[in-house]
């Protein structure tokens, strides 16, 4: 059918020509351009290295099918169970995985249209833009936006870091994301998208990624608004320091017998050896580098390297100027439950998970792995219902709150308050609807990750058997998200009768509940619990110094050192641009 090619499905980008495909959606067709390469494959000697833009290709590239998923750990906790399998890779694994997908209305928009860019979660060790739950056709058809989603390197491939080395500088998974954002700036206009109106959105580690781009100046100019769903860059799991990053990288090397001979070689030899190891070997040993038995902790994550991140996320948030930024943030009703079945004693999806007091105490140590004895005591004190200190259902729910508050709700609340206080316009939500189709048990409530299917409009697909109310609810949510992408405000511009979603401020702390009922405005995102995590616990720790003296000094030193290094780097860059450097 060469002569009858649909011109709507042929697009020319900087790298060359693309052929997409037309897809049916409820309400009309959309165009999809799947598996567009944006980066040279990071294979062989390029493993662990920062990305290089894709070189141009000849002819018309076929962009009609998803490409490989980045090499990653595959979850085998409950084989064949829908609740875990939906997050597992749905394409073959490969290190040659740096492709992105673009969904656009059919026919293409004639005037520049706001762009939504999705960053998937998965603890920085897993995830893919091709998962069914991120299917772009419903949102694009319903709201007429352009949607882009990239793959990025995860696990050891994306986040192995030997600080100071060129061979494994760390954070290359975030640099993959940044390169995709640069690709959007250069190419999205060809799809009808507006490069001057780009909204990043992501969930969990994807939301943490969105936040890290907010805090990294070279990324900041590549987008205009941000949505953080159930994750934040200041979460205790989202970054590590350079010392811990090096410890994990060298331990991984030891586990895969690098360098052979066992003598501690230099970084260059170590990385050269790691590059010879099959991808699966690295994945197989990935989890063994964590410092403690823990849940909601991941081995290879972004590192505070003084480059992508000039300081800790918390310090950057506190120091930042966020004038003119619009942000939408939120959490689900039961952030902690999903993680408990992955290692908290006494928990399973196949029973009520009633736990004993002893299991609760042990669970706190796994759920707050870095806590001193005293800090763990404080957590137990705060979360015990002292009228019913042995009640198994209450203890189960309390441990879920510990894990959810510590890792998601309170970091998100802290971020929202700081951004609002420093000039951003912030909208906040709690997502409270448990899908009628959910396969996880009732005690898990509305688990981490289960708002996504509604934001992407899956209930519009009749074969998925959602209810009519859920279909209407999904349409409402897509409208909020798309309004936010268009204007920076989720409210309907034309409909003053609809209940209004007010901005979140540090003082009033207003947020909305998202469920099948109309919007309801509430105040305080778990304000009491978050005062414990965000105000009291840090004081307790600095007073008792489980941050032993050495670490406290190290932290103070690091602040001095990082500002000195930034100064030195500027001086050196200035010097190296002078003539005398080139003819040595």
From Swiss-Prot:
Highest taxon of source: Eukaryota
Protein location: Synapse; Secreted; Cell membrane
Glycan attachment positions: 266, 351, 465
Disulfide bonds: 70-97, 258-273, 410-530
Enzyme class: hydrolase
Signal peptide residues on this chain, from the entry's feature table: 1
GO molecular function: acetylcholinesterase activity
GO biological process: acetylcholine catabolic process; choline metabolic process
A Pfam family it matches: AChE_tetra
Keywords (A to Z) from UniProt: Cell membrane, Disulfide bond, Glycoprotein, Hydrolase, Membrane, Neurotransmitter degradation, Secreted, Serine esterase, Signal, Synapse
GO CC aspect terms: extracellular space; plasma membrane; synapse
Role description: Terminates signal transduction at the neuromuscular junction by rapid hydrolysis of the acetylcholine released into the synaptic cleft.
Protein name per Swiss-Prot or TrEMBL: Acetylcholinesterase
